[in-house]
């Protein structure tokens, strides 16, 4: 199990302190499983590297500043989690009403935007994708704004966030501030910590299965996903994510849980 960050963050006053603490974690933070034996593991440090690079991309390529609007149309994917955290890092407002920046995985998700964002970030699902490998032409047919290839652009961004952290009163959702989000993250971390999540054998679990079955289809869902992820990470657990497009059955998920020493906390009543 990774270090429990609650003692360090119990009096935190900003999300920036959470991000800074996670950047020092070298144990697994995100573990992603999909079909064909695909497994991606990101330490806290690597996750925050993705977050910082993604936040810089939002600043440099999408003209994002504090209060700019962003919306993600996607099923749960580890890259989308990193990008949603980057939006918080940059002070963006999660909003699906005429967002300045849209995020999609393909033409089908791009078509869900009722009004074209100024910038559309295309994310590839491939584990080692260096660029978008899907049908770009199909995306052009449903979207008439500027299309940016996330995988091709993000790697060239600086490893450290180059912007200013948002003020605690900056809104993440309408009526929900950064300070509110921090309070929710710490609340969830304390819940994980108080339950002392354990395997059926009684041994401490190393990871918890992401419970949020939402897509990123609404701003509220997006925020619920990242709050659950950050709450678990602050409490010292890695977050196991199974690809929602893979259609894993409970019988298929069971050996994944066992191999990662992970727990589905819904079964334990968290």
Positions of the model-derived regions?
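Conserved AMP-binding/adenylate-forming
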Residues: 57-98, 197-237, 241-244
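Long terminal accessory regions outside catalytic cores
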Residues: 1-13, 33-40, 46, 55, ...
